[in-house]
């Protein structure tokens, strides 16, 4: 059984969280590795897909257990962001928790 981190805030870095998922027990395929200060970013505990107000682009936020953003990936749309997250984290599709309708 997977464990959900606490419910994320409604916004991360000013972007509205549309959906989120725990990554407990999910292997990150690491097709793209995020770096912080020249070192690989730590493995996220959860991911969130979010959209900034007035934008159609979406972001996949890699988050710590307390929902601090560790890294982010930019995508052309919400649908593309979701597919990218599901491709990078096989099994996450069954774990999405919807934060907002529509």
For each feature predicted by the language model, list its residue ranges.
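Short, Lys/Arg-rich amphipathic alpha-helical interaction segments
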Residues: 92-102
């Amino acid at each position: 059984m997977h464990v959900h981190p606490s419910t994320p805030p409604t916004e991360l870095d000013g972007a509205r969280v549309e959906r989120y998922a725990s990554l407990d027990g999910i292997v990150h395929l690491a097709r793209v590795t995020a770096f912080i200060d020249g070192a690989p970013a730590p493995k996220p505990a959860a991911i969130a897909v979010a959209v900034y107000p007035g934008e159609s682009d979406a972001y996949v936020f890699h988050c710590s257990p307390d929902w601090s953003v560790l890294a982010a990936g930019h995508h052309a749309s919400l649908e593309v962001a979701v597919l990218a997250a599901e491709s990078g984290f096989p099994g996450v599709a069954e774990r999405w928790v919807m934060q907002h309708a529509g």
